[in-house]
Amino acid sequence: MSTIRPVFYVSDGTGITAETIGHSLLTQFSGFTFVAERMVFIDDAEKARDASQRILAASERYRVRPIVVNSCVNPYLSVILAESGALMLDVFAPFIGLLEHELNTSRHSCVGRAHGMVDFETYHRRINAMNFALAHDDGVAASYDEAEVILVAVSRAGKTPTCIYLALHYGIRAANYPLIDEDLNSDQLPLRLRPYRKKLFGLTINPERLQQIRQERRPNSRYAALDTCKREVAAAEQMFSAERITTLSTTHTSIEEISSKVLVTLGLQREMF
């Protein structure tokens, strides 16, 4: 059996749902090279037939059955896609019937409900959270009064991407504070952070991994030196321990996992967008 498998994320909308679920499924299988292609806004029969032909062509090119992760709402489009002979993984089909029976009503076949701008209030909360994260990146803002979360770590430990993820996916007002040499000379929290102790969450990282990341940013600099990374990480961890700040290593942890841990630890109940 070939270890190369073509994968198609097909959607009548943005494809975010299909790609997210498909990626989560495929990461469970090692030893394969998945060649992925996104087919989005497949919202009529003509587009579905064209997509089906492209999928069929891939099966002939790779001499193996393609995998299709399909989130098209219209069942008729799914039938056309299935004519390609691919393995069809329908995101909605296994659950729609069960929900219709339980709720005693039929679904509304409306494209884009999962990631469309359906609720304007929610959308604006999300945008405002994103603006907040950018305005409070790397300790730029003077006040953290409105922050729901403040991530604390040395430079390049994963603070900014986690804040952006929390803002985009949960509408969380997330700020971050970079620990600098002056901060790391003490086991105590920096003065700016002390009033916000209940909002703090510490991130740490393996020094060797940190050195690799910093080397890409500033090659052969003192900033990227391994001994610098070791010293900063050790000092930050000592501070977190002394101040009893919950800490998580980002070395082998995804942004999704970090974000979930932050929400649970700080008791923030927020529905994912």
From Swiss-Prot:
MF annotations from Gene Ontology: ADP binding; ATP binding; phosphotransferase activity, phosphate group as acceptor; protein serine/threonine kinase activity
Keyword Magnesium among record annotations: no
Reaction it catalyzes: [pyruvate, water dikinase] + ADP = [pyruvate, water dikinase]-phosphate + AMP + H(+); [pyruvate, water dikinase]-phosphate + phosphate + H(+) = [pyruvate, water dikinase] + diphosphate
Sites where the protein binds ADP: 153-160
EC number: 2.7.11.33, 2.7.4.28
Record bears the keyword Kinase: yes
InterPro entries found in the cross-reference section: Kinase-pyrophosphorylase (IPR005177), PSRP (IPR026530)
Protein origin, superkingdom: Bacteria
Record's keyword terms, sorted: Kinase, Nucleotide-binding, Serine/threonine-protein kinase, Transferase
Family: Belongs to the pyruvate, phosphate/water dikinase regulatory protein family. PSRP subfamily.
PANTHER family named in the record: PYRUVATE, PHOSPHATE DIKINASE REGULATORY PROTEIN 1, CHLOROPLASTIC
Record's function text: Bifunctional serine/threonine kinase and phosphorylase involved in the regulation of the phosphoenolpyruvate synthase (PEPS) by catalyzing its phosphorylation/dephosphorylation.
Protein name as catalogued: Putative phosphoenolpyruvate synthase regulatory protein
